[in-house]
Amino acid sequence: IGVCYGIIANNLPPRREVVQLYRSKGITNMRIYSVQPQAIRALHGSGIRLMLGTTNNDVAVLAGSLSAATSWVHANVKPYHSAGVTIRYIAVGNEITGGAAQSILAAMRNLNKALAAARLGGIKVSTAVRFDVITNSFPPSSAVFAQPYMVDIARHLASTNAPLLANVYPYFAYSGNPRDIKLNYATFQPGATPVRDAGNGLIYTNLFNAMVDAMYAALEKAGAPSVRVVVSESGWPSAGGFAATPENARAYNQGLIDHVAHGTPKKPGHMEAYVFAMFNENQKPGLETERHFGLFYPNKRPVYHINFAGGRLAPVNHTNSHGFGGH
């Protein structure tokens, strides 16, 4: 399991203390959304592996020339790799939409070339997408990518053996459609009515599995069945809006942590996921819930108790689904 380290706040602890908090909780993977030299340097010798993001503003520049990508790699990857920091993934932007999304693939290609030239080809380059890059998401087997550019990205990921990074939020699907989606089903709790995918017979007992398998179905239809999904963000707010309570947030995030060892009905086995987020971020724009996704307050006190080791759940029931809107 990993945890996303966002910094849209004015009251967060020093970077080194953040890394110490990750280590003390046994969190072995970190996602950051831009190059933070202090945080990356603090990872040296920590055993924590990094998903490093480019900013969305970087993407057009990286797409524009190989030399820009080469400069970015030499400034932002090579020094830290040489110092012993394990960078696993580079995320080319986060939830880029509209016309800017057309630059993602060129930026990924240039970064792949720059990494290979720097003998850093083991670092996988991808992009982090919103769930709504797919449409027809229920039943999961009917899902397809909504835009042609995603088909091209999927095929490129297959050619480089890189995963698709997907931000998957049952919270938003549930809060947008509580009439049809039950809270237990959205939060990994027992008692949810299983729902069968008529397209392939698989049965779903939680919304997260259905959403991830919808991504897999879209990848298959794009001609990229070998691409695995890494859940690059998932979480539940503890305050600020509908169903946003510490109890629900704890149920969801603990359920997610316990769940990742078992995979989904379509892709059983270990999966990789990053909880959003480490801290409540008091300067995040948008709805009030956006400022309450943290596992910890800025003073490092937990918002609710989480066991990061996980392991509570039984394996996935592979013959067992529930509907959800296209969020």
UniProtKB/Swiss-Prot annotation:
Keywords per UniProt: Glycoprotein, Glycosidase, Hydrolase, Plant defense, Vacuole
Location relative to the cell: Vacuole
Tissue distribution of the protein: Aleurone layer of germinated grain.
Glycosites: N317
Location (main, coarse): other
A GO molecular function held by the record: glucan endo-1,3-beta-D-glucosidase activity
UniProt xrefs under InterPro entries: Glyco_hydro_17, Glyco_hydro_17_plant, Glycoside_hydrolase_SF
Enzyme class: hydrolase
Keyword Ligase (UniProt): no
Catalytic activities: Hydrolysis of (1->3)-beta-D-glucosidic linkages in (1->3)-beta-D-glucans
Domain of life: Eukaryota
GO BP terms in the entry: carbohydrate metabolic process; defense response
Pfam families documented for this protein: Glyco_hydro_17
One cellular component term from this protein's GO annotations in UniProt: vacuole
Coiled-coil parts of chain: none
Enzyme Commission identifier(s): 3.2.1.39
Active site residues per record: E95 (proton donor), E233 (nucleophile)
Family: Belongs to the glycosyl hydrolase 17 family.
Protein name (database record): Glucan endo-1,3-beta-glucosidase GIV
Source species: Hordeum vulgare (Barley)
